[in-house]
Amino acid sequence: MNKIKNESLQVLASMLIINANYVHGTLYLKEDGVHFKANGLLADKEIRSQFLFNEIQHIKFGFSFKPYRIVIKTFSDEAYIFDFVSKQEGKALVQPVKQNLSRA
């Protein structure tokens, strides 16, 4: 597995939880996977905040109606959608994750 630097990469994003409801926060790339830190009332509540590399089946980045989007699909067939992502930051986060997944 490719080693991720100890410095965490941060991407502002909003996690889609129910229909058109979003939880705003930040995605972090860490050594063990991708982590989501929610802001506001739902910070540290019952939303998924950790996506370990061995749980991620696929990750993709692309254009959506809400600038750009990151989708993380787990082996349990759940898709986690993060909208309002910056193009440059989103690509910078997804690329090393894909590299780690291809080497696993």
Kindly give the residue locations of the regions a language model identified.
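Anionic N-terminal interaction surfaces
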Residues: 1-31, 85-87, 92, 99-104
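Phosphoinositide-binding peripheral membrane targeting modules
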Residues: 17-23, 31-71, 78
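Generic hydrophobic/packing signal
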Residues: 60, 74-76, 97, 101
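Short, compact, well-ordered microdomains
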Residues: 66-95
